[in-house]
Curated annotation (Swiss-Prot):
It catalyses: a quinone + NADH + 5 H(+)(in) = a quinol + NAD(+) + 4 H(+)(out). NDH-1 is composed of 14 different subunits. Subunits NuoA, H, J, K, L, M, N constitute the membrane sector of the complex. Transmembrane segments: none annotated. This is NADH-quinone oxidoreductase subunit I. Keywords: 4Fe-4S, Cell membrane, Iron, Iron-sulfur, Membrane, Metal-binding, NAD, Quinone, Repeat, Translocase. Its main location: membrane. The keyword Metal-binding applies. It is an enzyme of class 7 (translocase). Its EC number is 7.1.1.-. InterPro entries: 4Fe4S_Fe-S-bd, 4Fe4S_Fe_S_CS, NADH_quinone_OxRdtase_chainI.
Length: 174
């Protein structure tokens, strides 16, 4: 008789949950809210005029404990300027197969060029597609931004960019 009672007691839990509202989430159809400080995918930011904030210093790559970041810096020229200052990140790659989402790269960046977004949907069925290049990482151009390369704002110095004194490009400059 005790063995029969054990089986009935086990089914009592099952029958009790049978009439409750399910706890499952409708994830693909209805994505849930994300915490504001969630560390999702990385983003390379731009200045308000469209120039890139990355100066190609490679500090993010050195800070990464998983060795997931590859940066190749290059010099800006008078004809091709991608960022204020003398250097820019010509090649920038993040290997999301290796990234552990710790955010140490964000802390190491001196120009706040690299931040993490709330986007968490990066799954893919191809390993090669999880190595994101600069084309996927750069923030999209907003209104008032010009796609680099283009010269710095007239009369502006590197310090003006770093101190936030540069605004969007006006129509007369375009």
């Amino acid at each position: 008789m005790p063995k029969l009672w054990d089986a009935v007691a086990g089914f009592a839990v099952t029958f009790g949950t049978l009439f409750k509202k399910p706890i499952t989430e409708e994830y693909p159809e209805k994505p849930g809210p994300v915490a504001p400080r969630y560390h999702g995918r990385h983003q390379l930011n731009r200045y308000p005029d469209g120039l890139e904030k990355c100066i190609g210093c490679e500090l993010c790559a050195w800070a990464c404990p998983a060795d997931a970041i590859y940066v190749e810096g290059d010099d800006n020229t008078a004809d091709e300027r991608y960022s204020p200052g003398e250097r820019y990140g010509r090649v920038y790659q993040i290997n999301y197969l290796r990234c552990i989402g710790c955010g140490l790269c964000i802390e190491a960046c001196p120009t706040r060029a690299l931040t993490m977004t709330n986007d968490y949907e990066m799954a893919d069925d191809n390993r090669a597609d999880l190595i994101w290049g600069k084309d996927k990482l750069l923030a999209p151009l907003q209104d008032g931004m010009l796609a680099p390369p283009h010269p710095m704002a007239p009369g502006a110095t590197d310090d003006d960019y770093y101190l936030g004194r540069i605004g969007p490009v006006t129509e007369d400059v375009r």
